[in-house]
């Protein structure tokens, strides 16, 4: 097999089989910065909100480029324990952050990886994604519990119900 493709008998089977181009190389790849869990109904949420469990919110991060304009705000986030790590864009060095710590060399060019917080925008989808409404953006509301919480009024586009359906949440990194 050359370049990651399985050896196929004919051109047609190289596209349609389980190890073919589409199913083997383009569909169903693992990605970072996402979560998958069961959904439950939460009518107290706004229709454009998704309830994200605290455990997931303390795992997934949003990159914040440090500039001369937001340097003080990023330092406050680090001191409050809301930043997982700093990444130096120039060297790629990763500096873990702890609550109460204030980095001495925080300067423009660093990227702070902040934990999810209320108001962040995430992309939610339920497979199979058959049409464009099966994947939509929602605002985060961090909630207690272990399941993603969704307003019952916005289940129709996802063809979802609350009988054990799982949904995927992706955190944009730009």
Model-derived regions, located:
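Core mixed alpha/beta domains of very large multi-subunit molecular machines
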Residues: 1-174
């Amino acid at each position: 097999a050359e370049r990651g493709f399985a050896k196929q008998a004919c051109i047609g089977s190289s596209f349609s089989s389980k190890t073919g181009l589409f199913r083997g190389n383009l569909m169903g790849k693992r990605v970072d910065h996402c979560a998958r869990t069961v959904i439950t109904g939460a009518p107290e949420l706004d229709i454009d909100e998704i309830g994200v469990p605290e455990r997931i919110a303390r795992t997934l991060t949003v990159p914040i480029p440090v500039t001369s304009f937001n340097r003080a705000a990023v330092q406050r986030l680090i001191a409050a324990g809301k930043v997982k790590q700093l990444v130096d864009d120039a060297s790629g060095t990763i500096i873990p952050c702890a609550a109460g710590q204030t980095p001495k060399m925080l300067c423009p060019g660093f990227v702070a990886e902040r934990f999810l917080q209320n108001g962040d925008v995430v992309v939610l989808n339920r497979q199979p994604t058959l049409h464009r409404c099966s994947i939509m953006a929602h605002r985060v509301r961090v909630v207690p519990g272990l399941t993603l919480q969704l307003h019952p009024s916005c289940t129709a586009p996802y063809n979802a119900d609350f009988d054990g359906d799982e949904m995927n949440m992706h955190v944009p990194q730009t």
